[in-house]
């Protein structure tokens, strides 16, 4: 059986404040601009995935193309500046403590996108856990 979750070359930032580097998924807080404004204030000029993602709250803004261009530019800049440490052929074990004290465990690796489908009722090995909003896919493709 071909398992579509594997080891891969994983990039992690070096010498970075990880509390500012990581942000929640871009499809969260879609109706709470204050949340994203607060995150931007916390991050400030520090390196952050906030500058590498397009929170869905901004998908309808007039400057979405400018945001996408900035994201792509930020990605290129970080690669050119040798900002990351590469862990070749790896998986990374993660632990996260929730506000209630419960520890969540995870494993970071790579997935074969040929084994993924967002279509309802799909039987592919990797499926969406919630309904996908098709209109939100094109901006994501421009970023990747």
Say what each PLM segment does.
Residues 1-143:
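A cross-family signal for N-terminal binding/gating loops and helix N-caps
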